[in-house]
């Protein structure tokens, strides 16, 4: 295994395949990247643009080039000394039929499927109508309406019968073939077909899940299907008879309904998913079903290829997607680690301010959202919080209390978006209460509301109590389930006390009982199940409510509205930044460091410019007042939304120049995500037309655009200075720097799909080549092309390549402090004793004049990797160090004798 020095993330899809990545291996190597970091590439839904919708863990995605293309990419990477890191998706699979063979088997055989236990499905739901079947919410209207319209049809392909609804296909349960085959046998006079009909009808019920019954069921149905295939081939009258019966069923809606009632699934109106779904999803995406990764055989079957690649060196590491969705994240990570102890494992884990990554997890660290928000906070002047807060409330009429907004959106998401998950948990809570006489009189409504309140008041994504130690974890086994991490105790106490305060109308003893359950003080099967499921629900609620809703409602200062961020946390000081870096070096020296990803709400360079507004709040407020007056006529039809308008102005300032279609698409998406006036599930066409009309009117307003350009112009270079500062910090802070595709040049993009547009690699290759002989002055002269950022990345990665010991697990971290008038505007630290990073912060108020500010360099001769200048240790003016390039990376060439 090779520890990554720097990773480069690519989004693989049919338009950018293994061969496209292979062709860039030389470029990545020249840039200084050590590992290509790939989006998921196991077999996904055909045409997938992202790969997170895996349908088959045993195959490589054919859309990307399949096994042959994968081998070519691996060979090309190896030729240039590059390793590979893969994004893993253990939490869920796509269930788009018929592409997922395991799910197809589940729909065909119900609880008796060999794969029924692979998926997080509630077969024993309290509702009789849904018991032992899977709700499939794909219909565009009520089931009966769709059935009568003839949109659901029975079809045959050889001996295989399927149900089709537009592009959706579903299997027909083997036992339910009896009536179809029997009718066809009568029609064509076939005794053999009649025999098959009787035999299909005598297959074990799908609810017979004992080993003998399931074995007989699967053996017999396969044999019977083979006989049916032979019969269709050898007796030409059978096929037409079968087709005639199928045609009759399609014409007789009652007959088709009776057939559908015998299936192991229940076709339903898509809106039913919000409250009646019987399986755990990835967030609210009905086609992504949760996996029971806690079961060892599920882990083994889903990780066969990945573990082989880790063993043979094809992969050096993995990124684990949505770790909080798993029932037992620590167990999962230990299995990965035990399979390949040297593998570099990072997890997509959102840490709330003050929350620490679990030290017991055998990983390198997170994927870097915590780092992203810390660095972002460095670029923000906290003094602007009061004026910006006051103006936001004045201009929009919206409350400036983000905690309140987040709580409201959690409640909204639980009730309207994740209602199915909440209802399943409520039903389980009711079952638990029935087993405890002191609590059995609580109503379903009370239990529902208590869970809602507790989930809403949990201050983090989730807790990590474990129901039992994984096999082989002797120390954990000895401690038993009674052991509760103090962090979990504190968090659950906070959730319960917050819930009590918010819902004084609910019997407080119910909350105390819920606390005992969540802390595993009651050890029954149902009691433990409740605690485990609660933990799996809180993460999706937080993500959907905060990241995907509140972040689009609370627009006070959107530079703070980033994945893993807290909009109420206005800025990060140098002391806090250094403390977090020291902690990282001590505990997570190989964590991933990122500033942009495929999931960020705004790219790093866009945020870097937006952060400048915190340095000029008065100018910004005056500008917005003027712009609002200029654009007042474009709000028509009596509709206006000043919160959306404020988001619009911030977005334009951060991303200007911005194509019309991009801002229109973004504003529509932001409005739907906010769920205030319109949403994805209930689009408000009148509101959306009004919003689009306002945006179009503003963009066509020559006076406004001229004033916008005048405002933005003096922010362009300081914004780039901020971008270079955060890039240098990422390149040299404790951890492994990651670069999102295309981000080696200025990267000004909005949330997906805007940040997943094609990257011009021909341009990047050309610029990298042209830089080989360039001076730093020539690089800066071509700043509009992005050369300063490309230069910084190449130079810093080259130093990491030459002296890896300075930056890895053994490279210590020491804060450095400037002296003088503008000392607070410098952020500096040393790595491994022989490398020093120096970057400016708050460049607008600095004004480019460092005055008497100095930095004390350790003794010896130091080379500035950005400029080639040599300086001697001792007190040196920052004006001199940063005269030729906005940031400095010094490497010690020799120590003092």
Residue ranges: model-predicted function:
Residues 96-172:
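Active-site region of glycoside hydrolase catalytic domains
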Residues 459:
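Active-site microenvironment for binding and transforming phosphate-containing groups
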